[in-house]
Amino acid sequence: MNRIEERLAALKEEGKKAFITYTTAGLPDYDTTKKIMFAQEKAGIDIMEIGVPFSDPIADGPVIQDASFKAIQNGASLEGTFTMMGKVRKAGLNSPVVFMLYYNTVYHYGVENFVNKCIENGVDGLIIPDLPFEEQGEIKDVLAKNEKSPILIQLVSPVSKGRIPMLLENARGFVYCVSQMGVTGKGAN
């Protein structure tokens, strides 16, 4: 069991739900992101979702796109985000951390190198919104090589009713339920 599974099991035993936050890494800078992470842990959040800045975040709406763009302008990168993660773990951050990023980032870094860096820096889970279940073979094979690998969080969308049982059967930790079609953070809903 990793930190995500441990936290969720404890919450289930207490009859509580998980409170999961989202923060864009490196916005406005990594020092601020680290402070935000420790403040969230102190406030009692259950799981932190850290968005790895990407130049073309197609599943995200204007707010997260803008945050990602500004973070990149300020020097944020995957390597910098890994370094930040290593520092917060060494400084005592115990909360589960999930990276939300796009598969292009993983692919260009090299899947095996990426997973090894996640393990080395204490990343507990991955949300990869542009990687459908049917195309997860390579990363799943690499993740399966090490019990300390992060959990690959499955996304379940409103149009996938026939796929829901398959996705749930293959899920670990939690599932990311897409509540509406389209990009996140767009409109008044």
How should each PLM-predicted stretch be described?
Residues 44, 118-124, 144-152, 170-177:
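Glycine-enriched alpha-helix->loop->beta-strand junction motifs that scaffold or abut catalytic
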Residues 19-33, 98-110, 151-159, 187-188:
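Active-site mouth loops of central-metabolism enzymes
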Residues 20, 46-49, 127, 175-176:
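Conserved beta-strand positions in the central sheet of alpha/beta enzyme cores
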